[in-house]
Amino acid sequence: MSKKVALMVVHQKRSSTGDVGLKLRERGSQLDIRRPVFCEKLPDRMDNHDLAVIYGGPPSANDNTDYIKYEIDWISNVLRDDKPFLGICLGAQMLAKNLGGTIKRSNDHSIEVGFYTLKPEGKGHKI
């Protein structure tokens, strides 16, 4: 069996894949790090990747920049190819927009909610 490849999308020149990247490496995955903000292209198909992670960063999914729109649209490729996807902060906003959701400030004007523990619910559950 070949080594798994995780596509990691980050938004700053010196961004790290952090604990997620570390855990994926510990489990034998190779990381393919891309930065669309610096005009790095994302694959049209996920044939050579086993999963995708889009990280956070300074922008909002509501920003009207070409690379933000490109990433939001690109998520459809991951979903179409039925690959696991993890959106962290901005990445979660992008997934919500891709699926037709709305991104807005909270009523208390807080910027983020902080850490939240995710628990696997099993394979094959569709959104």
Predicted feature descriptions by range:
Residues 1-66, 70-83:
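N-terminal beta1-alpha1 cap of cysteine-dependent amidohydrolase-like domains
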Residues 54-125:
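Cysteine-nucleophile active-site neighborhood
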Residues 15, 22, 113, 125-126:
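Helical cap/lid subdomains and adjacent loops of hydrolase enzymes that gate the active-site channel
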